[in-house]
């Protein structure tokens, strides 16, 4: 049963993250005639919706069923992709992006919590590495395909493929068994409340540090993903080159991430995570500096994601071990909510500075601000022992 759940979950990770439009979304929206103001409004609608609904949907999943929550979210994502394909009204698409935020909130933590409950804690680091590999492989394949699709302007084909992938995701989730938890989790779960979730966070420095890291990291990196293709296009790289760069970057990250179990067996996990986290910030700064030669941009982008893939499984396993099983969905949802907060703050920051600076400079400034919060939280998180 456990092996079947893990296999189905990894399949879910691959299919749910397959999106040919992801790295070329802003390019596509410009292609069909939307202004940058409209595009920014859509992005904000998604993040605000996710921010508002992350905790309520996680709470509902913990109380009434994680699998049902995940299925509702996947159906919502199907609606979002269909809207991207067919809708050309800015207001309706803003609504579709809000639907995406709701869908992501429903999926966030729900299926993952079923998977976490099916494996032992000492397996999490190893399986987290496998999960990251599957995650990056899905992104790499879809990014490479998306680059060719964007270059040819064949977005109908790409969005149709994304819809098919989401339908297959729905089938996989239906097949995932949701085990009824026994005495250790059932009783606390039924008595859980938002106040209990808040108290759990307030009394746990690991959770607080993880949430601060998620928020500050989103402030610096979410928009980097959203505007990645436009950034490279501004430096003279076409969509195919962008897609191939993303694919190489993701596959390199996944491959390097496989060495984490071996590496942490011989080095201090906390120190290893701190070094990788700080190196990632430095490499990202080199990618964003306007004077960096164009031919070095793919190199720095690949290396910064490799650094992240090396320490992410360690950071996440610390968070997973600190999250109480009876409210794990809710805590994972809070984690996702912090990502939404960071993204919203960046888009507001971008709106305030867009008239006096370009997106590359704004991202560089955001990276510097985020580092002031991220680095202390990283040190606090990795100095704890669970």
Predicted regions and their residues:
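Helix-loop junctions on the cytosolic side of multi-pass membrane transporters
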Residues: 162, 170-188, 378-386
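Juxtamembrane intracellular "pre-TM" segments in multi-pass secondary transporters
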Residues: 1-3, 178-212
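Helix-to-loop junctions at the C-terminal end of transmembrane segments
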Residues: 52-65, 150, 255-269, 354
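Symmetry-related core transmembrane helices of the 12-TM Major Facilitator Superfamily/SLC fold
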Residues: 157-175, 361-378
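Cytoplasmic helix-loop-helix junction between adjacent transmembrane helices
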Residues: 98-136
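Hydrophobic core of transmembrane alpha-helices in multi-pass small-molecule transporters
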Residues: 14, 80, 91-107, 295-311
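Helix-loop boundary and gating motifs at the non-cytosolic
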Residues: 1-52, 205-247
């Amino acid at each position: 049963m456990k092996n079947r759940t893990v296999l189905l979950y990894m399949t879910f990770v691959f299919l749910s993250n397959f999106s040919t439009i992801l790295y070329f979304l802003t390019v596509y929206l410009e292609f069909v005639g939307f202004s940058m103001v409209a595009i920014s409004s859509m992005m904000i609608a998604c993040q605000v919706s996710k921010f508002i609904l992350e905790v309520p949907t996680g709470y509902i999943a913990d109380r009434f069923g994680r699998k049902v929550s995940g299925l509702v979210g996947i159906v919502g994502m199907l609606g979002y992709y269909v809207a991207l394909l067919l809708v050309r009204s800015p207001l309706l698409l803003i609504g579709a992006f809000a639907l995406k935020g709701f869908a992501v909130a429903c999926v966030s933590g729900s299926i993952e919590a079923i998977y976490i409950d099916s494996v032992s804690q000492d397996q999490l680091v190893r399986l987290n590495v496998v999960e990251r590999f599957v995650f990056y492989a899905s992104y790499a394949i879809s990014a490479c395909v998306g680059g060719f699709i964007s270059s040819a302007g064949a977005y109908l084909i790409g969005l149709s493929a994304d819809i098919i992938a989401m339908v297959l995701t729905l089938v996989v989730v239906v097949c995932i068994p949701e085990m009824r938890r026994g005495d250790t989790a059932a009783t606390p779960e039924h008595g859980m409340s938002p106040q209990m979730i808040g108290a759990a966070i307030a009394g746990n420095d690991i959770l607080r540090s993880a949430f601060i890291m998620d928020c500050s990291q989103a402030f610096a990196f979410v928009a980097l993903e959203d505007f990645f293709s436009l950034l490279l296009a501004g430096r003279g790289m076409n969509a195919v080159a962008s897609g191939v760069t993303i694919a190489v970057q993701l596959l390199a990250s996944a491959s390097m991430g496989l060495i984490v179990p071996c590496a942490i067996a011989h080095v201090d996990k906390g120190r290893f995570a701190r070094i990788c986290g700080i190196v990632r910030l430095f490499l990202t700064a080199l990618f964003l500096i306007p004077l960096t030669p164009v031919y070095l941009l793919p190199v720095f982008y690949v290396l910064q994601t490799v650094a992240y893939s090396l320490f992410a499984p360690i950071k996440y396993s610390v968070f997973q071990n600190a999250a109480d099983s009876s409210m794990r969905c809710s805590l994972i949802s809070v984690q996702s909510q912090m990502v939404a907060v960071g993204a919203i703050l960046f888009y507001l920051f971008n709106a305030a500075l867009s008239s006096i600076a370009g997106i590359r400079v704004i991202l560089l400034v955001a990276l510097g601000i985020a580092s002031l919060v991220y680095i202390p939280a990283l040190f606090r998180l990795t100095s704890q022992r669970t």
